[in-house]
């Protein structure tokens, strides 16, 4: 790296031109008097003491007190490590500040979307979603890709799993799982894209499966954003599930209770198979004052269309309409739905 380029990099890290020049000069000379630094670097004599004192405050120079006073450069590895730590700290603080500013305006978190390169990495991410989900897993994929997820899916008996695929017959390894709903997808090509969603925390999606020669160049999209994923869940149902044929219903009575679900459309999908009424606890926010609320009661009805999805909960003294995130017609915006029986 040329000397001029080094000086430019140091200035990017917060040093002035004279400070960068003085530190570089000390690296060449070793411990030196201020007059020697002036002579070698060309920094004006009237400025050199202020420059060296500033470098000492910033951790680039040690002052050796004595007669004459010497200035020694701090080991570059120590200096660069401190710069790295400070940069990371500043970036994290900025990230937090930006997110808070964004929320003040938009009322939601910054969407986080990454591109995942490589087919094996995509499989790893999909398996991670299945392993880490706490309440429900939604999958739409060709059966060929579903086989890559078999190992982790077989181990999950504690969460609701809904799988849409181009089944020719029900796989034996899924047939006897009480917590699984299976649906056979329509045959339109756009119905064969892959979506893997865990709760409303993580989502992975991609188009067609790659041929062997294209697996290294393959990429998918990884999403972490509650507000964004709730839209994906909406599309999962209205685009895929509602246009598919259920080939294996949920064995609701054999599932462990209470059963916590993360999206209103998932709740209604379960209620359609479990039947009404059902005792439920809902944690969410009142649309009237935006305050956190918890209600308990019986689900006595539901409404489910491509545009709306809500349940009617009867408490001791009234009927309450509960929707999901983004609700605007209901009384409560539900965030967590707990079926009690």
From Swiss-Prot:
<dbReference type="Pfam" id="PF11495">
    <property type="entry name" value="Regulator_TrmB"/>
</dbReference>
<comment type="subunit">
    <text>Homotetramer. Forms homooctamers in the presence of maltotriose or maltose.</text>
</comment>
<comment type="function">
    <text>Global transcriptional repressor of the maltodextrin transport gene cluster (mdxE operon) and most likely of all genes encoding glycolytic enzymes. Acts by binding to the conserved TGM (Thermococcales-Glycolytic-Motif) sequences in their promoter region. Can also interact with non-TGM sequences.</text>
</comment>
<dbReference type="GO" id="GO:0003677">
    <property type="term" value="F:DNA binding"/>
</dbReference>
<keyword id="KW-0805">Transcription regulation</keyword>
<dbReference type="InterPro" id="IPR051797">
    <property type="entry name" value="TrmB-like"/>
</dbReference>
<comment type="similarity">
    <text>Belongs to the transcriptional regulator TrmB family.</text>
</comment>
<dbReference type="InterPro" id="IPR021586">
    <property type="entry name" value="Tscrpt_reg_TrmB_C"/>
</dbReference>
<keyword id="KW-0678">Repressor</keyword>
<keyword id="KW-0804">Transcription</keyword>
<dbReference type="InterPro" id="IPR002831">
    <property type="entry name" value="Tscrpt_reg_TrmB_N"/>
</dbReference>
<dbReference type="InterPro" id="IPR036388">
    <property type="entry name" value="WH-like_DNA-bd_sf"/>
</dbReference>
<feature type="DNA-binding region" description="H-T-H motif">
    <location>
        <begin position="32"/>
        <end position="53"/>
    </location>
</feature>
<protein>
    <recommendedName>
        <fullName>HTH-type sugar sensing transcriptional regulator TrmBL1</fullName>
    </recommendedName>
</protein>
<dbReference type="Pfam" id="PF01978">
    <property type="entry name" value="TrmB"/>
</dbReference>
<keyword id="KW-0238">DNA-binding</keyword>
<dbReference type="InterPro" id="IPR036390">
    <property type="entry name" value="WH_DNA-bd_sf"/>
</dbReference>
């Amino acid at each position: 790296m040329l000397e001029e380029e080094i000086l430019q990099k140091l200035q990017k890290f917060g040093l002035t031109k004279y400070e960068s020049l003085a530190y570089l000069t000390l690296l060449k000379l070793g411990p030196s008097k201020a007059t020697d630094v002036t002579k070698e670097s060309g920094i004006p004599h009237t400025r050199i003491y202020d420059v060296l004192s500033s470098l000492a405050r910033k951790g680039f120079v040690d002052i050796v007190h004595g007669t004459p006073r010497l200035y020694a450069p701090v080991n570059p590895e120590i200096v660069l490590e401190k710069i790295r730590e400070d940069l990371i700290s500043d970036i994290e603080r900025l990230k937090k500040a930006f997110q808070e500013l964004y929320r003040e305006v938009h009322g939601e978190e910054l969407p986080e979307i990454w591109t995942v390169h490589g087919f094996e990495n995509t499989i790893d991410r999909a398996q991670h979603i299945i392993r880490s989900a706490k309440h429900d897993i939604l999958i739409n994929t060709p059966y060929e890709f579903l086989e890559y997820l078999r190992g982790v899916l077989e181990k999950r008996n504690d969460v609701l799993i809904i799988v849409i695929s181009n089944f020719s017959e029900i796989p034996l390894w899924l047939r006897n799982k009480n917590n699984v709903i299976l649906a056979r997808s329509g045959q339109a090509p756009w119905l064969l894209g892959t979506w893997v969603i865990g709760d409303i925390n993580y989502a992975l999606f991609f188009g067609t499966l790659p041929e062997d020669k294209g697996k290294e160049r393959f990429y998918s999209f990884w999403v972490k954003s509650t507000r964004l994923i709730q839209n994906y869940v909406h599309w999962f149902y209205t685009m895929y599930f509602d246009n598919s044929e259920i080939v294996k219903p949920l064995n609701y009575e054999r599932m462990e209770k209470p059963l916590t679900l993360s999206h209103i459309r998932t709740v209604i999908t379960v209620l359609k198979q479990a039947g009404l009424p059902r005792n439920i606890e809902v944690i969410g926010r009142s649309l009237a004052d935006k305050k956190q609320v918890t209600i308990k009661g019986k689900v006595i009805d539901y409404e489910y269309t491509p545009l709306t999805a809500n349940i009617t909960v009867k408490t001791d003294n009234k009927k309450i309409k509960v929707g999901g995130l983004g609700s605007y017609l209901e009384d409560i915006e539900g965030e967590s739905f707990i079926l009690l029986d």
